[in-house]
């Protein structure tokens, strides 16, 4: 697809956005790099094209649209709820395909009816694809990071391990490596004797003072590196994590959860059965999941094409709940993907918490599917 031209179905796509009351928004191609480096996820970070301004500020070519759309919303102090639509180029280093390609999508900001907004995102993504690819049967894979977080929390793991596991959600290779480390801990070795003694004593102030003294003696600047307090707390956390072992029963509970893969119509019962058998209370996460399934049915979405996979996530760190991807049945090419990102706008500087959900289309892949028809 020549990048100097829009896809031939672009006008039809924009009409679909208009019909869904989504306002077209443009964002600069050159973006501040920091938000992407901080919260976009490791998979995207290593694909970003970096540059810098004359003053040395880190910049990048726009690698995706969600963060730029949210930044523009905050800058313009626009009220919510608000639906934005976008269509434009993004720039990523890719093993296959062009490094610059078109994406389009909708970001739905500020709707406090979470189940309804989630259902609308999935319904819009599948509905638009059905118009662009008539006669194709679509397949939707759905996951929920909030349910995974509830399972990890209910197992009573130390907070540091919870954060690590949640951060790895959706990356089974990384998740399996972390679980292996929990089953067979690798104890921290090579600690300075004085530091090991101070950590064992629990005297944080003495540990901080010792680290500060060592930094001064070796010429480390606290302005150019972590502070003594940060170093002390990271060392303590590392030691605690290295000494934490996941017992066999808890390990098998996590394995059982991650193996769940059922049609969405059966997912609520499967999750309830899992929680009862494991003796876990999943509380609000399960209630929200069930509410979303009900909202999808109420919105007329064809539930027969939706599967729930407990281990499914997307490689962007800002997702907080629903995640989903859409393919043509029998194909592995992801045509649309999205999810819920309720913490993102606050992280980017919004004064109030703004619930948000959205999705994006991969237009080059849609064009390939249309050409194959």
UniProtKB/Swiss-Prot annotation:
Give the principal location in a single coarse category.
cytoplasm
Tell me the keywords, alphabetical order.
Answer: Amino-acid biosynthesis, Cytoplasm, Histidine biosynthesis
**GO MF annotations for this entry?**
histidine-tRNA ligase activity
Compartments in which it is found: Cytoplasm
Q: In which pathway does it act?
A: Amino-acid biosynthesis; L-histidine biosynthesis; L-histidine from 5-phospho-alpha-D-ribose 1-diphosphate: step 1/9
BP terms from Gene Ontology:
histidyl-tRNA aminoacylation; L-histidine biosynthetic process
One GO CC annotation, please?
cytoplasm
One Pfam family it belongs to: tRNA-synt_His
Role played = Required for the first step of histidine biosynthesis. May allow the feedback regulation of ATP phosphoribosyltransferase activity by histidine.
Q: What else is known?
A: This function is generally fulfilled by the C-terminal part of HisG, which is missing in some bacteria such as this one.
**Complex formation:** Heteromultimer composed of HisG and HisZ subunits.
Q: Which family does it belong to?
A: Belongs to the class-II aminoacyl-tRNA synthetase family. HisZ subfamily.
Q: What is this protein called?
A: ATP phosphoribosyltransferase regulatory subunit
Q: Which organism is it from?
A: Rhizobium etli (strain ATCC 51251 / DSM 11541 / JCM 21823 / NBRC 15573 / CFN 42)
Gene designation per UniProt? hisZ
């Amino acid at each position: 697809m020549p990048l100097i031209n829009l896809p031939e179905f672009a006008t039809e796509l924009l009409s679909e956005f208009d019909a869904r009351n989504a306002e077209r928004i443009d964002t600069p191609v050159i973006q501040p790099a920091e938000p992407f480096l901080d919260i976009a996820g490791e998979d995207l970070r290593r694909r970003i094209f970096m540059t810098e301004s004359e003053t040395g500020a880190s910049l990048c070519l726009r690698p995706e649209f969600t963060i730029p759309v949210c930044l523009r919303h905050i800058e313009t102090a626009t009220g919510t709820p608000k639906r934005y639509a976008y269509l434009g180029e993004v720039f990523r280093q890719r093993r296959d395909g062009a490094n610059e390609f078109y994406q389009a999508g909708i970001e739905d900001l500020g709707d406090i009816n979470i189940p309804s907004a989630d259902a609308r995102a999935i319904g819009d993504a599948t509905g638009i694809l059905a118009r662009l690819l008539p006669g194709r049967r679509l397949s939707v894979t759905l996951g929920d990071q909030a349910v995974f977080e509830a399972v990890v929390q209910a197992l009573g793991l130390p907070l540091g391990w919870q954060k690590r596991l949640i951060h790895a959600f959706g990356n089974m290779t990384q998740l399996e490596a972390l679980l292996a480390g929990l089953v067979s801990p690798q104890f921290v070795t090579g600690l300075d004797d004085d530091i090991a003694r101070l950590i064992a004593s629990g005297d944080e102030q003495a540990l901080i003072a010792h680290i500060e003294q060592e930094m001064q003696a070796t010429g480390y600047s606290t302005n150019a590196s972590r502070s003594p307090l940060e170093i002390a707390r990271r060392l303590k956390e590392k030691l605690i994590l290295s000494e934490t072992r996941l017992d066999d029963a808890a390990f098998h509970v996590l394995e059982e959860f991650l193996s769940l893969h059922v049609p969405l119509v059966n997912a609520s019962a499967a999750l309830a059965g899992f929680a009862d058998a494991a003796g876990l209370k999943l509380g609000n996460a399960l209630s929200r999941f069930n509410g979303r399934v009900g909202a999808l049915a109420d919105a007329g979405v064809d539930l027969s094409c939706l599967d729930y996979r407990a281990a499914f996530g997307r490689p962007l760190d800002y997702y907080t709940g629903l995640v989903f991807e859409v393919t043509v049945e029998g194909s592995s090419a992801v045509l649309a993907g999205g999810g819920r990102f309720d913490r993102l706008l606050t992280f980017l500087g919004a004064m109030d918490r703004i619930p948000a959900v959205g999705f994006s289309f991969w237009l080059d892949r849609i064009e390939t599917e249309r050409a194959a028809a």
